[in-house]
């Protein structure tokens, strides 16, 4: 699958061009017909010398046949962990297709697990880019770099921010409305990535979505004795449940 890290005749590491797979699709989401392109593949992030230091594997869904002067939003999505690929939000929540799990989600149940259209996806209102951080999914370090070079809060956020700037440059999306969407530890990552994008890379964000926020692990858990703050953090979700 990877187009990276093969061996040159002299025994050195040979980094090839990124591998990508592109297909065209059409479906109806939230009552709207959407023709879209699915791109599964690698994007290289580079060091200060311009050499690839890691490949991040992503699944991107972008709408086709845009109206004249239409500026389509793009949302960058990841799970948490740290150590989780984006499979769960991709195939279980926000992607255009989902895996059907014949259970109440406490256990996956027994196979087979069919794949069906996901009418609740948000692809009707925004393009979607599901990102696997370095060391998860098919994403990995390249050349002389190692996974541990990317496995810290700051290092992780820097690699994700570098990916976003690379992606919007390669795809001509600097002027698109841009959003981050993270889950659990992914909310911590989103806050860190947003700071780097805004302060260091001159990328302005239109919004951030926190799912199962974990910005403060100690303060947001009800399992710490007498921690009343945790219940306050649940109020927005409880309100949403009662009004939906």
Give names to the regions the model predicted.
Residues 23-60:
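N-terminal cap/lid segment of alpha/beta-hydrolase-fold proteins
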Residues 209-219:
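Active-site nucleophile loop of the alpha/beta-hydrolase fold
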Residues 182-192:
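Glycine-rich nucleophile elbow surrounding the catalytic serine of serine-hydrolase chemistry
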Residues 242-243:
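Conserved small/polar residues in nucleotide/adenosyl-binding loops
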Residues 150-168:
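Alpha/beta-hydrolase active-site loop
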Residues 173-184:
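Alpha/beta-hydrolase fold nucleophile elbow
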Residues 179, 207-209:
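Residue in the alpha/beta-hydrolase core beta-strand immediately N-terminal to the catalytic nucleophile
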Residues 2-8, 50-149:
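N-terminal cap/lid subdomain of alpha/beta-hydrolase-fold enzymes
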